[in-house]
């Protein structure tokens, strides 16, 4: 009988000796504990959708999804004068909004595609379309976008958005389009 009581006491002592006095709190967050501050791990699950980040309320701006990318275009806004690549004042507020979103979301990358109307040589239009894309990139950077997250490409007169038979159509073809994606 004494052996049984002794065995039970030893077992109880062994169980209490193996228990920890630390409190475990489960499901408190993901990340590293540093003085009770948690760094949330940046996972796909907790990222906002691109549509919630890239938001415009200006007329003439269209945003559509193609696969994992957003395509932002401004078909109703005249972005560039004939044979010019200077960014027009009327579009600067929208571009500043885009730059702010890009600066605040470092994982977002953007490709700027520049276009021209069909007047001029193919080589000249290709060069002009690159200058237009670069002018937009430079403006975005000046307003807080991260330059290394922006690429540019010129397409000249390829892929017209409108007819080249009228001045109004040619004006809409002098444009850039933005392909926005997660990096």
Predicted regions mapped to residue ranges:
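A short, charged
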Residues: 100-124
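Periplasmic OmpA-like peptidoglycan-binding domain that tethers envelope proteins to the cell wall
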Residues: 115-183
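C-terminal motif of bacterial Sec signal peptides marking the signal peptidase cleavage site
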Residues: 14-17
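Structural recognition of the beta-strand scaffold that forms the well-ordered cores
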Residues: 71-73, 109-111, 151, 177-178
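Periplasmic peptidoglycan-binding/tethering modules of Gram-negative envelope proteins
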Residues: 22-106, 183
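Positively charged n-region of N-terminal signal peptides that target proteins for export
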Residues: 1-4
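Sec-dependent N-terminal signal peptides
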Residues: 6-11
């Amino acid at each position: 009988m004494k052996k049984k009581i002794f065995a039970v006491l030893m077992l109880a002592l062994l169980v209490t000796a193996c228990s920890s006095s630390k409190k475990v709190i489960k499901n408190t967050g993901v990340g590293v504990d540093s003085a009770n501050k948690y760094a949330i791990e940046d996972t796909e699950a907790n990222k906002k959708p691109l549509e919630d980040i890239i938001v415009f309320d200006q007329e003439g701006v269209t945003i559509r999804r193609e696969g994992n990318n957003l395509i932002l275009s401004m078909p109703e806004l005249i972005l560039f004068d004939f044979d010019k690549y200077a960014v027009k004042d009327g579009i600067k507020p929208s571009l500043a909004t885009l730059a702010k979103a890009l600066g605040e979301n470092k994982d977002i990358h953007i490709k700027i595609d520049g276009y021209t109307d069909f007047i001029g040589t193919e080589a000249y239009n290709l060069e002009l379309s690159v200058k237009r894309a670069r002018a937009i990139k430079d403006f975005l950077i000046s307003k807080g976008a991260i330059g290394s997250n922006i690429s540019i490409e010129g397409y000249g007169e390829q892929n017209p958005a409108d007819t080249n038979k009228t001045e109004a159509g040619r004006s809409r073809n002098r444009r850039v389009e933005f392909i926005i994606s997660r990096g």
